[in-house]
Amino acid sequence: QTCALPISWEDFEKADFEEVQEDRGSARINRVYRQLSVCPVMYWEKNDDADALYLKNQRQWISKYLKENLGGNLEIYKNMACLTLENDDCYGTVHPRDAMLPEAVLLVCQKIQDELAIGKLEKTENERIFMSRKKFADLVHECRDKWLAGWSKEFREMDEKKLLETIVKYMEDWLMIRCENEQIVIYPATGRLSGVYPDDFKGDVKK
């Protein structure tokens, strides 16, 4: 004999809704951990972004879990979060590293920060900076002109178009910028790391 409990369509709908909510919660947790562990940075547009709220509310536990399993420190800012690793914890390709391209990008990031500080550039409410592709190209070439002696032979002699494409691709890959036709969107990660040569830099030419 089969026994059945009385159940209504409302019960089915409630059960389905609860399962959906549970699935969404699990998906959100997986998404947040995945972004922090395999992506350079995690961004959000609005303060009420569900992933961002989960991250902020659970930052203590997320930070603890990531540190125990991957090392490093969880850093959370207004519209971004990232996992920064010490040298001993690093895995895969890292930024920055001891190579000319990351070094050039650090100088470009510093130039952007300098122009922001003096009012030549402005941030939007969600921490983005919008710049024409030409303006960005001029900024890159200004960095090379200023620090030419410190750049490697390959980068000193690289034509302007290739230099721009090389730096743009690197910064896109590391989620620092996004290209939109003739406009460059600069993301908050650009302000996270930057570099300058020391004040006593004499311009020793790199091979």
What are these regions (language model features)?
Residues 3-5:
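Short, small-residue-biased leader/transition segments that mark boundaries at the very start
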Residues 1, 155-170:
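Short amphipathic alpha-helical interaction segments
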Residues 174-175:
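Glycine-centered, phosphate/nucleic-acid-interacting loop/turn motifs that mediate DNA/RNA or nucleotide
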Residues 47-118:
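Long, low-complexity, charged/polar intrinsically disordered regions in eukaryotic proteins
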